[in-house]
């Protein structure tokens, strides 16, 4: 059995710093940049102007731990690999399944947001929206077959369009810093702040998926941490700016679709003809996020099948891409989208339940950091654990969904599941693996 490093070398190493920043930024903005500003404004009003900086502060220690782990242990398995190094192969496979379990809730939510722009442009309803979602899955397959570098090049264009659009809104709307009013401390309601944070966390879902691409950086030790931190700060700044715009123009209401606020502002400033531009950019940002996630899920499945090298899902395409795994992922997405359509499940519910799983994954990665890291990074990992617990508490009873999924997979891996032979390196002694940073 080839060692892990040889397995990872089968994937193309074609990403640099700029491409990494672009991939993460567009992934984080993706489905949220048009929807979350209005959802945050609805949940907390002006308080959301404080909520975004607070969320960035909460996420920052977590992001640094992800960056350090991805720098020193680059692997297409991402979080599951880190957890496996810290706690052994059984929990590694549990985490892999936990990450994959987010597909039934996160992908339909993201696809629904994406094709919502078709509704704004063409008045799509019901079956038309469903066909739009299925067509988007076809485009995801096409991009997945082109590799990470091609995705980064496309997403560089998307990132440029997003920044240009926001700059145009600020310029045409003549919005100045003095026009943005932060609420006083005594006006902040803790319950509304927690509600906003629980929804807004969706904007920073993507960090864990980004770690699956760490092994495809040309120089992961140098470029991966920088790409992660720069991308995080850039995405957070754009989210805050968009929320300030939505609040400034007052375009948030229960009667307005989640993705309609910024397009309404654009139509108000530039005329109805600009709606095309807004909707195309909105769709592309959602597509960018979906693209990163689809490729991340495929790489996770591929790494988990490496200990059955003859398996269909363990094979790479001639272009050294895990296309078989990608096919399975997109087929699952197709089925889950059909189920959500048939049952008419609410978008907000999908987002919050998905957030619970992602926060659980972040918590487990922080626990792995506590085991693998020493020094200042150990302290950050402990802080990250506490922050993840706080975020789970903010979700309230809805966080039980993630807990139940975790319990089911843990029980399944303990009883009744055929054991797979793992190499000795997967459960090696970690006494010499701690990093003093």
Regions found by a protein language model. Name each.
Residues 115, 127-176, 187-190, 228-233, ...:
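Membrane-interface loop-to-helix entry segments
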Residues 1-38, 42-47, 59-60, 64, ...:
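Membrane-interface "cap" regions at the ends of multi-pass membrane proteins
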Residues 39-43, 61-137, 141-145, 159, ...:
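Hydrophobic transmembrane alpha-helices that form the core helical bundles
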Residues 7-11, 49, 54, 123-135, ...:
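Helix-loop-helix junctions that connect adjacent transmembrane segments
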Residues 42-46, 74-76, 85-91, 215-223, ...:
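Juxtamembrane helix-boundary/capping and inter-helix hinge elements in multi-pass membrane proteins
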Residues 367-437:
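A generic transmembrane alpha-helix motif of multi-pass inner-membrane proteins
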Residues 79-88, 120, 124, 229-291, ...:
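TM-loop-TM module centered on a large, flexible mid-protein loop between adjacent transmembrane helices
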Residues 33-37, 114, 143-149, 273-274, ...:
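Transmembrane helix-loop junctions in multi-pass membrane proteins
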